Amino acid sequence: MSASDAATPVVSAFYDRFPYPADPLQDGPPPGYNWRWCVDSVRAFCVGVLPPPAGAPRPWRILDAGCGTGVSTDYLCHLNPGARVLAVDISAAALEVARERTRRSGAPAQVEDLRIEQRSLLDLADEGPFDHINSVGVLHHLREPEAGLRALADLLAPGGLLHLFLYADGGRWEIHRIQRSLSRLGVGCDAAGLRLGRRLFSDLPETNRLRRHHEQRWALDTTADANFADMYLHPQESSYDVRRLMAFVASS
């Protein structure tokens, strides 16, 4: 029987309504260079290991755990030529976008193998090991994030690296206030909730602290409906301070 988190049904339904991230599709490689998705650069930065010489015995094995609409997958393919890439997510709608994104960018031609599959990161025991695991903005949407971290740790090859991104309490205090306010007003995580959430922002006085902070910091990031919903309407998320983060890592 496949494994899943208790929050999987509600989270997958949320991302089927709001495929995320909402970055536009384009023809050709993704823009710019993002070193955190280049395995050679990450290894050189984190452990001081030089890239393997040309003709190394095997390609990098990369897992994109929670790939969403494929923005990270696209970079992972283009920045790691010849790699073997597995990208998984629980949202069918997001994966449909991911497949179209990578097709249009030419990502499959850059790597030895690219698989994009609807699977939980908790259900990958038959895969791996992986030299590099990318999990950005995923574990904090599990009901039991510790189980997700243990599952990813078990998939790492000896000497492998895990690129993990989690929400931080300190960077989200104003977002948490807005989330709590919307929740108390009965704003849901569907299309109606999205409309009401946006209207509430516009109805707040221009001098309101939360509106002002949103307009100064997040307005551009949340222009797309999926990005607004992911930030303010998500049905399942947690965040960490340093102490809880260290305890979380130790739990794996």
Each language-model region and where it sits:
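N-terminal, positively charged/glycine-rich alpha-helical extensions of SAM-dependent methyltransferases
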Residues: 1-32
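Conserved alpha-helix/loop element of class I SAM-dependent methyltransferases that forms part
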Residues: 27-59, 75
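Conserved class I S-adenosyl-L-methionine
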Residues: 59-68, 161-211
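Class I SAM-dependent methyltransferase SAM/SAH-binding core
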Residues: 63, 73-122
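A short acidic, Gly/Pro-enriched loop at the edge of an enzyme's catalytic core
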Residues: 122-132
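A short SAM/SAH-binding and catalytic strip from SAM-dependent methyltransferases
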Residues: 131-144
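A short glycine-rich, Lys/Arg-flanked "PGG" loop and its adjoining helix->strand segment in the class I
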Residues: 146-158
